[in-house]
UniProtKB/Swiss-Prot annotation:
Function, in words: The surface protein (SU) attaches the virus to the host cell by binding to its receptor. This interaction triggers the refolding of the transmembrane protein (TM) and is thought to activate its fusogenic potential by unmasking its fusion peptide. Fusion occurs at the host cell plasma membrane. The transmembrane protein (TM) acts as a class I viral fusion protein. Under the current model, the protein has at least 3 conformational states: pre-fusion native state, pre-hairpin intermediate state, and post-fusion hairpin state. During viral and target cell membrane fusion, the coiled coil regions (heptad repeats) assume a trimer-of-hairpins structure, positioning the fusion peptide in close proximity to the C-terminal region of the ectodomain. The formation of this structure appears to drive apposition and subsequent fusion of viral and target cell membranes.
Organism phylogeny: Viruses, Riboviria, Pararnavirae, Artverviricota, Revtraviricetes
GO biological process: fusion of virus membrane with host plasma membrane; symbiont entry into host cell; virion attachment to host cell
Name of this chain's protein: Envelope glycoprotein
A Pfam cross-reference name: TLV_coat
Length: 668
């Protein structure tokens, strides 16, 4: 069981496995996910897969956002090994493997290390090496040197077997026996799983993009050959409840032209306060998911303009968002969606009131059949809900017997199969196959970060990343008038209630204007069809010589009543404002920036040649000086060498002291 001291030679870290090379290549060819909204809640599933057999070792699902759903995953080592570890029969005690209980038990006491395959490091090898061709490639594991990393995405450690019969390092281990084979063994587990592992995500793993599966290699640390196991970690993101259409109009989800319906005059009926202090309301009954608002004042004869009506919608949404989530409104853009659907429904939970007598909101007359084409979320459902819409239900009630009326809380509505209404009759609901979902109604206003809007003004052809936009309903869904006042303190609740009611009034005014627009469009289409039919009949008869087409037909002349002139005027004003903004924006740009906007290829060309051009310019500027310095330095070195050579050929004379000599004298 003892292995050599770390490090070991890398020659023991290779083996032939052509199938794993192919799997490793396929992992790098996976398509990425679309960038999602960071605030959207999804059903996220993390999967650990054996790359050799393709069997899932673990699949953990939970609800959350893409930025915080990183659970701790538990799986067994034998689930990512399978039958790939088959020690030689000539090795009676290999100490590893998953085919026998004794080998599974001995494998528990063997250290292991894990190497990432997503790093694409050449020195670490490929799948045939377990991405651990040399020492230093390991980033996590259970060894005596405790490998760590500051850049890898996961950590893998040993766990503890479940149940009261746990394994220890010194003797018998019941969980290592498969209860399907050894049913009489005490403590036997399913599949003999006694090598639990714990996988956790690091901070880098939480920040990376899991747009495809990422692979790792696990190797046992033992004397001789270190066996290899390959596994991958992947994330699957699914919406909890995809938006579904609610209402009798089956063509609106596809946004096709509406079918011609009978012209019904819009009638707004103000309701007097109830005995319990209720506020007047305006309701729409038997409408195809007709958007309406509950606590509003009676309609004024004078209708506000389109611009003011749209501004009130955005302003009411901003005030509500500012009160409930002020951090989101410090620097943001709220954009009103100009294409259908203009409203969306969010299914919520709430406490409705049960009344024996019909309230005033149930006595209104049907109006135009407006339909909300998107209902998402999970909320309270009444009656028998078909399987196609059960995803919208978090709680389902069968309703009540008898003649009862269920009134939705303030700020919410019953989205039924036959239309949107503030109250429902149980007698009608029990008699028909209708069903209802408690919903909130929100205008489709998207929330954008400031960088997204600025990029449009700068006319950038591309973005660094896909823009993230979400509707305000996703940020404020479930915040009703009653819910805000119930879940917060009294003063704050009253303030938020006032903001929410202001938004509701703006929505109601906008919906009434939409109804009037639909009526005007119906009249315009009817008038146009009459003109077309009359011209066709006149052209067939060709009685123009008798005084004209109308005289020949002996009927009143029909003329096209154009009720869309205001639309054309508004569009002309809009184009004029856009042109003025574009001129103002162009005047604030310099010439170089204008070149970049007019020629998209100019940016690519400049960025490609700028580097070599700068290098060439630096060489021309500083090249002569550097060359002179280099030549002077070489000359100095050569001069020193010549001086040394000449010095070695001569010997320096010493300083000898010269004494005076006395010449001999002769005596005469």
């Amino acid at each position: 069981m003892e292995g050599p001291t770390h490090p070991k030679p890398s020659k023991d870290k290779t083996f032939s496995w052509d199938l794993i090379i192919l799997v490793g290549v396929l992992l790098r060819l996976d398509a990425g996910m679309a960038n999602p909204s960071p605030h959207q809640v999804y059903n996220i599933t993390w999967t650990i897969t054996n790359l050799v057999t393709g069997i899932k070792a673990n699949a953990t699902s939970m609800l959350g956002t893409l930025t915080d759903t990183f659970p701790t995953i538990y799986f067994d080592l034998c689930d990512i090994i399978g039958n790939t570890w088959n020690p030689s029969d000539q090795e009676p005690f290999p100490g590893y493997g998953c085919d026998q209980p004794m080998r599974r038990w001995q494998q528990r006491n063997t250290a292991f290390y894990v190497c990432p395959g997503h790093a694409n490091r050449k020195q670490c090898g490929g799948p045939q090496d377990g991405f651990c061709a040399v020492w230093g490639c390991e980033t996590t594991g259970e060894t005596y040197w405790k490998p760590t990393s500051s850049w890898d995405y996961i950590t893998v450690k040993k766990g503890v077997t479940q149940g009261i019969y746990q394994c220890n390092g010194g003797g018998w281990c019941g969980p290592c026996y498969d209860k399907a084979v050894h049913s009489s063994t005490t403590g036997a587990s399913e599949g003999g799983r006694c090598n639990p592992l714990i996988l956790q995500f690091t901070q880098k793993g939480r920040q990376t993009s899991w747009d495809g599966p990422k692979s790792w290699g696990l190797r046992l640390y033992r004397s001789g050959y270190d066996p290899i196991a390959l596994f991958s970690v992947s994330r699957q993101v699914m919406t909890i409840t995809p938006p579904q259409a609610m209402g009798p109009n089956p063509v609106l989800p596809d946004q096709k032209p509406p079918s011609r319906q009978s012209q019904i005059e819009s009638r707004v009926i103000p309701h007097h306060p109830q005995g319990n202090g209720g506020t007047p309301g305006i309701t729409l009954v038997n409408a195809s998911i007709a958007p309406l608002s509950t606590p509003v004042t009676p309609a004024s004869p004078k209708r506000i303009g389109t611009g003011n009506r749209l501004i009130n919608l955005v302003q009411g949404t901003y005030l509500t968002l500012n009160v409930t989530n002020p951090n989101k409104t410090k620097d943001c853009w709220l954009c009103l969606v100009s294409r259908p659907p203009y409203y969306e429904g969010i299914a919520v939970l709430g406490n409705y009131s049960n009344q024996t007598n019909p309230p005033p909101s149930c006595l209104s007359v049907p109006q135009h059949k407006l339909t909300i084409s998107e209902v998402s979320g999970q909320g309270l459902c009444i009656a028998t809900v078909p399987k196609t819409h059960q995803a919208l239900c978090n709680k389902t009630q069968k309703g009540h017997r008898g003649t009862h009326y269920l009134v939705a809380p303030n700020g919410t509505y019953w989205a039924c199969n036959t239309g949107l209404t503030p109250c429902i009759s149980m007698a009608v609901l029990n008699w028909t196959s209708d069903f209802c979902v408690l919903t909130e109604l929100w205008p489709r206003i998207t929330y954008h970060e400031p960088e997204y809007i600025y990029s449009h003004f700068e006319n950038k052809p591309r973005f660094k990343r896909d823009p993230i936009s979400l509707t305000v309903a996703l940020m404020l869904g479930g915040i009703t008038v009653g819910g805000m006042a119930r879940n917060r303190n009294r003063d704050c609740g009253l303030l938020e209630t006032a903001q929410f009611r202001q938004l509701q009034m703006a929505m109601h005014t906008d919906i009434q204007a939409l109804e009037e627009s639909i009526s005007a469009l119906e009249k315009s289409l009817t008038s146009l069809s009459e003109v077309v039919l009359q011209n066709r009949r006149g052209l067939d008869i060709l009685f123009l010589q008798e005084g004209g087409l109308c005289t020949a037909l002996k009927e009143e002349c029909c003329f096209y009543a154009d009720h869309t002139g205001l639309v054309r005027d508004n569009m002309a004003k809009l184009r004029e404002r856009l042109k003025q903004r574009q001129q103002l924006f162009d005047s604030q740009q310099d010439g170089l920036e204008g070149w970049f906007n007019k020629s998209p290829w100019f940016t690519t060309l400049i960025s490609s040649i700028m580097g070599p051009l700068m290098i060439l310019l630096l060489i021309l500027l500083f090249g002569p000086c550097i060359l002179n310095r280099l030549v002077q330095f070489v000359k100095d070195r050569i001069s020193v060498v010549q001086t040394l050579v000449l010095t070695q050929q001569y010997q320096r004379l010493g300083q000898w002291r010269l004494r005076p000599t006395v010449s001999p004298q002769l005596n005469v």
